C-alpha cells in the first residue's frame, strides 16, 4: 500500500510561507516548501548576489548571505498577495553587511508554485 502526500494549494503554500517568514525561519521555508529544482533569480547586475538553481545551491546562497550579516537592525515581511500560480510579498531589511556597511533594502519577492512546491523565487530591488 502506498501512502500519498496531499499536494498543498497555492493558498496553503503562501499561508505556511507567511507563518514561517513571520518568525524569520527562512531555511525552514526552503526545507519545507522549495522544490528540488527551484530557481532563485536576482535583479540583473545585483551588487549582492547571483542567481542559483537547485535546492542545494539556493540554500548555499542563503547561508553565504547570512554569514555576511554583521548586525541585524530590523526586518519586515508583508502578507502574501496571490495571483494564479504566483504569490508575492514585500520584504524590508535594515542590516549591516560585510563589504557593504549598513544597508536598508526594500524589495518585492515573487514566488511561483507548481505541484504544491515553490519552483521559483525572484527578487526585485
Give residue spans per PLM region.
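A solvent-exposed, acidic/Ser-Thr-rich amphipathic alpha-helical stretch
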Residues: 7, 27-80, 85
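Residue-level signal for well-ordered, solvent-exposed loop/turn and beta-edge residues enriched
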Residues: 39, 101, 117-119
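A short hydrophobic beta-strand element
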Residues: 83-93
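Short hydrophobic/aromatic-rich beta-strand segments that constitute the beta-sheet cores
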Residues: 40, 89-90, 120-121
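Short, low-complexity N-terminal intrinsically disordered segments enriched in polar/charged residues
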Residues: 1-28, 32-36
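Short beta-strand edge/turn micro-motifs at domain boundaries
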Residues: 106-125
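Short, surface-exposed coil-to-beta transition loops
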Residues: 74-76, 103-109
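Short, cysteine-centered beta-strand-loop-beta hairpins and adjacent loop/turn segments enriched
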Residues: 68-71, 95-104
Amino acid at each position: 500500500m502506498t501512502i500519498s502526500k496531499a499536494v498543498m494549494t497555492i493558498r496553503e503554500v503562501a499561508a505556511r510561507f507567511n507563518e514561517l517568514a513571520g518568525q524569520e525561519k527562512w531555511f525552514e521555508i526552503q526545507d519545507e516548501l522549495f522544490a528540488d529544482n527551484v530557481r532563485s533569480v536576482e535583479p540583473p547586475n545585483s551588487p549582492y548576489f547571483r542567481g542559483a538553481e537547485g535546492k542545494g545551491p539556493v540554500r548555499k546562497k542563503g547561508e553565504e548571505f547570512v554569514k555576511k550579516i554583521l548586525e541585524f537592525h530590523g526586518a519586515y515581511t508583508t502578507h502574501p498577495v496571490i495571483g494564479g500560480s504566483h504569490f508575492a510579498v514585500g520584504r524590508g531589511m535594515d542590516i549591516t553587511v560585510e563589504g557593504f556597511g549598513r544597508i536598508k533594502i526594500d524589495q518585492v519577492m515573487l514566488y511561483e508554485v507548481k505541484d504544491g512546491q515553490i519552483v521559483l523565487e525572484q527578487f526585485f530591488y
